């Protein structure tokens, strides 16, 4: 009896493990709170749908062909000398080429439109924030207001925020998933990032680049 129960548990263990792991995930990228993140979500969904154009037919054909040409199906058409089909060649080459061309144009336009250093068009004066990554915290300086904070930033909603980012230690990745666009913080260099929050809230910020033992706790809060 115990052995039977053990086998039943082991049978569903992968499913249970998967559910537990996924329960700790958040679909932040699919629930954007800013202009840049909304445009990036559209790009992700478009690329995903184009991928399904290839993936779904392949999966269906694998299932259909396996069933149709199974050993027990004596009624299946048998063509041992088949070697070429112009129709098949046209499909397997044309569809991927069209998808690649579409993605190439989309990527080119999106890369320039979502360039992190490109200022956002707005009638509202942007907020300037200097960002310095340290071990294992974030230092934020407001040069216009003459104040500084650690692991917390606050800015007005619907107002562009111009980040000037560098590192006082090793390289890190500055990322507010709900607002979009990750960019590196590098020692001796300055990178720029322009974001805007479309609604009020407190958003999680992280270091998206592994930089050492304490990187998992290198988080901050961004409040709009």
What would you call each of these model-derived segments?
Residues 11, 50-53, 126:
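Hydrophobic transmembrane signal anchors and adjacent membrane-proximal interface regions, especially
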Residues 43-69:
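Alpha-helical transmembrane segments
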Residues 20, 61-64, 106-109:
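Transmembrane alpha-helix boundary/anchor motif
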Residues 7-15, 46, 88-92:
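Alpha-helical transmembrane segments of integral membrane proteins
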Residues 26-43, 67-224:
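Non-transmembrane, membrane-proximal soluble domains of secreted or membrane proteins
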Residues 1-27:
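N-terminal secretory/membrane targeting signals
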